[in-house]
């Protein structure tokens, strides 16, 4: 009976408590606890964010709170924090006691409340350069400036999953780590700095919003709107995503978007106005600096026009010899290529156009090397601006007049071409080269004729004024002028007139550079012979000086040598008179210091006696040679004298011309003995010298008489200079006769040798 009773009791117990009822209870308990953790997750996240942004900042609870304080402390997720104020509890009701399948996302916004902005102040934002940018003014339309936006959301799983017993403590520990990182990050964000900067000035506000509802930016400056407009590529905001917490019911996520600028401050209206003025001044200054005149950013049109002529020119090649000549070029007209009013390219002193318009030629027959050196000098000076920045290319841009006839001195450089406009009377510098000095001719008369008629700067510049110092009593300058007065070295073929010069300038310059170089190479043997002759002359000169040293007298000067040679010539004349009764007195002047500069005279025979005397006087005046160094003419007959050294005396016979009432009468033949050392192969050509005309202006006739007339017109200003030249010749003759009377006999005839084959004409 007792056993039956026990079996009945066990059956009743099993009927009230089935085997699966315990498992279901445990499952429901786990789901309820996980749901509570998810709900507290939203609350705890809002509490951490609001505590770091809200006013006043709550104090950290103590480790051993009292019973009253413990009731106000939130201990969830192992973070002891003061409970959320009652004002915010109503906003959090939406996330309490709600089904997880319908729980909405939570949005927490932190903003600057502009409603309490003082009337006399303005909220500004400072950029990286500490320039203020106006954010909002008092009583404006914008009442809020959004600084950051937090998003807390839960994504439920689409499939049902069983909550495991060990899952709850794992998810809880993951949430603890996440909240601790958020707690530290909220105090490192820009909004926390804004809270410190605007403390007791402007409060920060917070909003808890339903993430399922649209967010309106009306009446406030939204998070997506930039305040500083200078940023082009980089954004004014950034986003941060935290590590999510995964559960069997769903995933918990937290992210934030915030402004990177935090330099918000309040400025007085007057202070802001002055700062705006200062900022505008700085911007204008930067614009002026960027648009100011510089060698790289100045007038593009000027740069194009000034560089365009250079592109059409071949590469510049420097001539191997510093050969200069004075040639007359025909007038060439060219339109102006500059634009008035443009700024200068470089900050250099302006150069007058009269000095820029001078073309420099290398050869006397207007060969192509004329244009090559002229192009070289123009390119070298094209970057130097004048007042109107006009690059000169063989033209006068203003008046359209012809280009002035060019000249070149013995320097072969730009020193003699460009004249300083501040000092118009500066003496030009000369650098002589003995190898090429015989190829130059310098005439102040032709320079006077070649003065340009107009100036780019509106000034009356003159070549005469620029070269007025050429007549100074300078021994070196006189020596150079004497050298430059001799005949020119011809590089090319026969001479051509003005039309030939124009034709040669239009030919390619590079081919003529090669021709000039070949011509110089062909003259190597002659220059070698010239060098040997100079060396021999120096040796003879040393012998002569050693012979004179026996007299215990110092080295003779130019005048002493001149007097000595006059004595030698007197002795020579006495010997001639004793040998032949028909021999007349013959005088010769020898320039001991620079006698070899008379070489390289080409054969030419003047056909008129007037032209002979005119040529002598013009050469003396153009070179500014003193009477003691001029080549005089004396009455007599030529004679031959044998000498032991290579010294040359060229006898030039002519007739003395005198005019009375327009009638010309011829007197006895005159003979000029030009003495000089044998320094050139042309000296040994025993023919009467003929002076080649190198100043060809017209090519109508090629006869010698017309060439002589044209040369006379260029070297003189008129026929009236003939009489003055005759008077000067007479004075020189008197001076020579006086020296002959005072001279004594001298047996030393080392430096005297006459031309054996000279003849009268």
Curated annotation (Swiss-Prot):
Gene Ontology MF annotations: protein kinase regulator activity
Ranges for region Disordered:
1-25, 277-367, 398-456, 488-507, 544-642, 691-761
The induction annotation reads:
Expression is induced during biofilm formation.
* Bias (Low complexity) ranges: 1-10, 290-303, 327-340, 429-444, 566-590, 632-642
The knockout outcome noted for this protein's gene is: Reduces the formation of biofilms. Significantly decreases the resistance of biofilms to fluconazole, itraconazole, terbinafine and caspofungin. Leads to autophagosomes with shrunken membranes with undefined edges. Also results in partially dissolved contents of autophagosomes.
Keyword vocabulary terms for this entry: Autophagy, Cytoplasm, Protein transport, Transport
- Biased region (Basic and acidic residues) positions are 600-613, 710-720
Principal location: cytoplasm
User: What is the annotated localization of this protein?
Assistant: Cytoplasm; Preautophagosomal structure
Top-level taxon of origin: Eukaryota
The Gene Ontology biological process terms listed for this entry are:
autophagy; cellular response to nitrogen starvation; DNA damage response; mitophagy; piecemeal microautophagy of the nucleus; protein localization to phagophore assembly site; protein transport; single-species biofilm formation
Transport: present as a keyword of the record?
Answer: yes
Q: Which GO terms describe its cellular component?
A: Atg1/ULK1 kinase complex; autophagosome; cytosol; phagophore assembly site
Compositional bias per record (Polar residues), positions renumbered to this chain: 344-367, 400-411, 445-456, 614-631, 721-730
What does the UniProt function comment say about this protein? Plays a key role in autophagy. Activates the atg1 kinase in a nutritional condition dependent manner through the TOR pathway, leading to autophagy. Also involved in cytoplasm to vacuole transport (Cvt) and more specifically in Cvt vesicle formation. Seems to play a role in the switching machinery regulating the conversion between the Cvt pathway and autophagy. Finally, plays an important role in biofilm formation and resistance to antifungal compounds such as fluconazole, itraconazole, terbinafine and caspofungin.
Q: What family name appears in the similarity comment?
A: Belongs to the ATG13 family. Fungi subfamily.
Describe, as the record does, how this protein assembles with itself and its partners.
Interacts with ATG1 to form the ATG1-ATG13 kinase complex.
Q: What is this protein called?
A: Autophagy-related protein 13
What organism is listed for this UniProt entry? Candida albicans (strain SC5314 / ATCC MYA-2876)
Taxonomic classification? Eukaryota, Fungi, Dikarya, Ascomycota, Saccharomycotina
User: What gene, per UniProt, encodes this protein?
Assistant: ATG13
């Amino acid at each position: 009976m007792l056993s039956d009773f026990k079996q009945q009791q066990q059956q009743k117990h099993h009927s009230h408590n089935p085997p699966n009822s315990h498992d279901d209870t445990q499952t429901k308990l786990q789901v309820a606890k996980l749901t509570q953790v998810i709900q507290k997750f939203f609350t705890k996240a809002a509490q951490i964010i609001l505590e770091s942004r809200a006013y006043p900042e709550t104090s950290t609870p103590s480790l051993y709170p009292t019973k009253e304080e413990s009731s106000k402390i939130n201990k969830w997720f192992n973070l002891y924090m003061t409970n959320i104020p009652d004002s915010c509890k109503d906003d959090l009701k939406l996330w309490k006691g709600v089904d997880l399948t319908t729980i909405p996302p939570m949005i927490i916004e932190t903003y600057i409340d502009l409603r309490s902005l003082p009337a006399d102040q303005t909220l500004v934002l400072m950029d990286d350069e500490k320039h203020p940018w106006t954010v909002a003014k008092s009583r404006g339309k914008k009442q809020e400036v959004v600084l950051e936006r937090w998003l807390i959301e839960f994504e439920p799983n689409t499939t049902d999953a069983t909550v495991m017993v060990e899952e709850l403590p794992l998810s809880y520990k993951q949430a603890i780590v996440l909240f601790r990182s958020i707690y530290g990050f909220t105090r490192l964000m820009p909004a926390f700095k804004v809270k410190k900067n605007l403390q007791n000035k402007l409060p920060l506000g917070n909003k808890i919003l339903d993430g399922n509802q649209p967010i309106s930016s009306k009446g406030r400056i939204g998070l997506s709107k930039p305040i500083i407009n200078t940023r082009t590529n980089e954004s004014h905001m950034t986003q941060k995503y935290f590590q999510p917490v995964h559960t069997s019911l769903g995933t918990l996520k937290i992210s934030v978007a915030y402004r990177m600028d935090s330099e918000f401050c309040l400025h007085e209206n007057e202070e802001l106005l002055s700062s705006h003025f200062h900022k505008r001044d700085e911007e204008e200054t930067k614009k002026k600096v960027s648009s100011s005149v510089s060698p790289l950013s100045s007038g593009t049109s000027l740069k194009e026009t000034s560089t365009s002529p250079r592109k059409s020119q071949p590469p510049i090649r420097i001539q191997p010899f510093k050969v200069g000549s004075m040639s007359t070029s025909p007038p060439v007209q060219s339109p102006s290529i500059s634009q008035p009013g443009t700024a200068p390219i470089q900050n250099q002193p302006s150069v007058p156009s009269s000095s820029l318009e001078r073309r420099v030629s290398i050869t006397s027959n207007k060969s192509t090397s004329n244009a090559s050196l002229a192009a070289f000098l123009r390119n070298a000076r094209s970057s130097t601006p004048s007042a109107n920045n006009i690059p000169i290319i063989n033209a006068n841009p203003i008046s359209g007049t012809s280009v002035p006839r060019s000249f070149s001195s013995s320097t072969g450089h730009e020193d003699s071409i460009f004249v300083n406009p501040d000092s118009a009377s500066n003496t030009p510098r000369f650098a002589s080269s003995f190898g090429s000095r015989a190829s130059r001719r310098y005439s102040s008369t032709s320079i006077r004729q070649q003065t340009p008629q107009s100036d780019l700067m509106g000034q009356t510049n003159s070549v005469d004024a620029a070269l007025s110092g050429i007549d100074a009593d300078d021994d070196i300058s006189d020596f150079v002028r004497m050298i430059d007065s001799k005949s020119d070295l011809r590089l090319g073929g026969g001479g051509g007139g003005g039309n030939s010069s124009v034709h040669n300038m239009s030919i390619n310059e590079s081919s003529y550079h090669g021709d000039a170089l070949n011509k110089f190479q062909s003259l190597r043997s002659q220059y070698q012979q010239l060098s040997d002759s100079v060396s021999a002359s120096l040796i003879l000169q040393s012998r002569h000086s050693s012979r004179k040293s026996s007299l215990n007298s110092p080295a003779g000067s130019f005048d002493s040598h001149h007097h000595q040679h006059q004595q030698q010539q007197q002795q020579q004349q006495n010997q001639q008179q004793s040998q032949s009764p028909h021999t007349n007195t013959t005088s010769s002047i020898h320039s001991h210091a620079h006698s070899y500069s008379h070489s390289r005279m080409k054969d030419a025979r003047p056909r008129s006696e007037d032209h002979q005397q005119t040529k002598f006087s013009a050469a003396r005046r153009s070179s500014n040679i003193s009477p003691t160094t001029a080549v005089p003419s004396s009455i007599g007959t030529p004679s031959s004298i044998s000498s032991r050294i290579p010294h040359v005396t060229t006898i030039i016979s002519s007739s003395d011309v005198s005019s009375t009432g327009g009638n010309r009468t011829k007197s006895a033949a005159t003979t000029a003995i030009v003495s000089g050392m044998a320094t050139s192969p042309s000296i040994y050509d025993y023919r009467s010298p003929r002076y080649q005309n190198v100043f060809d202006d017209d090519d109508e006739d090629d006869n010698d008489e017309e060439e002589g007339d044209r040369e006379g017109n260029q070297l003189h200003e008129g026929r009236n200079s003939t009489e003055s030249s005759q008077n000067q010749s007479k004075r020189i003759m008197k001076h020579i006769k006086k020296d002959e009377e005072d001279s004594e006999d001298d047996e030393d005839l080392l430096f005297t040798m006459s031309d054996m084959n000279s003849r009268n004409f």
